[in-house]
Amino acid sequence: MPEIRQLSEGIFEVTKDKKQLSTLNLDPGKVVYGEKLISVEGDEYRTWDPRRSKLGAMVLKKFDIPLKRNSKVLYLGAASGTTVSHVSDIVSEGAVYSVEFAPRSMRDFIGLASRRKNIFPILADAGKPDSYAHIVEPVDVIFQDVAQPNQAEIAARNAVRFLKKDGYLLLSIKARSIDTAASPKEIFKEEVKKLEQAFEPGFEVLTARELMPYHEDHLGVMARLKK
């Protein structure tokens, strides 16, 4: 019998031969990206590969993930939905507003969204939040995984527009999308400084950790707007 350990609300460690990060499948019997399904006492868990998910890596790097069953989430950089599907599992009674700029990725993503009533796909540029302001309500959490040079600016624009006063920003900073020559550590230091000082009202950075060994040259950041 597999062993289940809850790491935080909606996030589990399932041990069957080995420990595997998992979420409770909101769409039983269906897989999204080739993950394993594990049944335990009538519940079905989907394994969550941290090497294919920045948020999954942040869980294993001991971030205090603030997602709840009824959370409203704005996900920037949805791609084809690998991580969005796990967020959908976690916020089973909430909503995941999922922004993706690439039409090809969105075509793949639409199939996933059609099976999960809490996913709302939005084909848009995450750098232009006003273009989807008529769709997105105030959210509890913003998760951002976009490979653009102005990652901090995009996060700030969306947080000011949509994040509740007591909400949280979870951000994956990809150093090589900002500067291919500079030291990743220097890039991370500068991007955190931008979050804290370059935008009004600015962010209070709560946690910042590199996502190795799961993702090279990536920094995970958890922050909230300054009060």
Swiss-Prot record:
Presence of keyword Endoplasmic reticulum: no
Q: What does this protein do?
A: Involved in pre-rRNA and tRNA processing. Utilizes the methyl donor S-adenosyl-L-methionine to catalyze the site-specific 2'-hydroxyl methylation of ribose moieties in rRNA and tRNA. Site specificity is provided by a guide RNA that base pairs with the substrate. Methylation occurs at a characteristic distance from the sequence involved in base pairing with the guide RNA.
Indicate the transmembrane segments per the record.
none
Organism in which the protein naturally occurs? Methanosarcina mazei (strain ATCC BAA-159 / DSM 3647 / Goe1 / Go1 / JCM 11833 / OCM 88)
**Domain of life, per the record?**
Archaea
UniProt keywords (A-Z) are: Methyltransferase, RNA-binding, rRNA processing, Transferase, tRNA processing
Q: Which family does it belong to?
A: Belongs to the methyltransferase superfamily. Fibrillarin family.
**Gene3D superfamilies assigned to the protein according to its UniProt record, in alphabetical order:** Phosphorylase Kinase, domain 1 (3.30.200.20), Vaccinia Virus protein VP39 (3.40.50.150)
Q: Which InterPro entries does the entry link to?
A: Fibrillarin, Fibrillarin_CS, SAM-dependent_MTases_sf
Q: Cross-referenced HAMAP family, in alphabetical order?
A: RNA_methyltransf_FlpA (MF_00351)
Q: Which EC number(s) does the record attach to this protein?
A: 2.1.1.-
Give GO terms: molecular function aspect only.
histone H2AQ104 methyltransferase activity; RNA binding; rRNA methyltransferase activity
SUPFAM superfamilies associated with the record: S-adenosyl-L-methionine-dependent methyltransferases (SSF53335)
Residues binding S-adenosyl-L-methionine, per UniProt:
T82, T83, E100, F101, D125, A126, D145, V146, A147, Q148
Gene Ontology biological-process annotations: box C/D sno(s)RNA 3'-end processing; tRNA processing
Q: What is this protein called?
A: Fibrillarin-like rRNA/tRNA 2'-O-methyltransferase
State how it assembles.
Interacts with nop5. Component of box C/D small ribonucleoprotein (sRNP) particles that contain rpl7ae, FlpA and nop5, plus a guide RNA.
